[in-house]
Amino acid sequence: MMKKPLIVLTGPTAVGKTKLSIALAKAVGGEIISADSMQVYKYMDIGSAKIRKEEMDGVPHYLVDVLDPAEEFHIVKFQEMAKEAMEKIYANGHIPILVGGTGFYIQAIVKDIDFTENEENTEVRAKWEQFAKENGADALHEELAKIDPKSAESIPAGNVKRVVRALEFYELSGKRISEHNEEQKAKGSPYNFAYFVLNDHRELLYERIEKRIDEMLEEGLVEEVQGLKDRGFTKNMVSMQGLGYKEILDYLDGNLTLEEAVYILKRDTRHFAKRQLTWFRREPEVSWVHKYEYDYDNEKILAAMLDVLKEKGIVTA
């Protein structure tokens, strides 16, 4: 059976994916699925750098502005929603283009990672949750380190939910969750895909990040977060943990001055971009697109991307 086509356009935050994604979609007859853990939420426009209606230029977008901030958005939900969108796009005779910077989300689609076969048992889970309550998160994390050191390395002790999940998985299946995840990643892709990573010189990227945050503040980021707060959204919600939201919330709650909040936001966004790039470097089969090699000209970048897509038989010459 012929593999269905899939295009990925990713890269670190503030690198300039949005504009290029529209040009790409128009050139190949594509529709865009957002692979972004924040743009999926309603009322969170400025801090998530959400694409505006007029920027979409008629290109259909999925997974943008669809969830209430009180709803949890996680990898399994993303995968479900994205696959549903892909079916619609294929039915339209178009090519799905995954656009966004959340590497794990992209991998879940490209590799079609199976999260559902992870058995669940509320009794076992409750036992470990109780253990954490009585002995603390660090003691729980030590239990994980004993049976699955690899998972313990990648899951922080503070993420009790994931630590419990890993312990539960081991108890039920007799298998380490890290091994299960490695097996899933080693699978081939069910798609004929091209995976583009847009990148730039680090110092220029950092400059863009700083500038973008200054612009967000000018556009009314503080007011946006205040509005969310007024609607009853609190900092323990997944949505409010996003970059730009948790820092401004800390300012509004009187824990930081605005200057401190902005300093932390800029610093943490730079760190985030660095982590994104580390993730993409570990991914096999990616096509790096360094903007400076094309004189920062989107037309030249697009032409190079189209060459790759023709080579892979995703689009015809």
Describe these PLM feature segments.
Residues 1-317:
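Phosphate/pyrophosphate-binding catalytic cores of soluble transferases and nucleic-acid-acting enzymes
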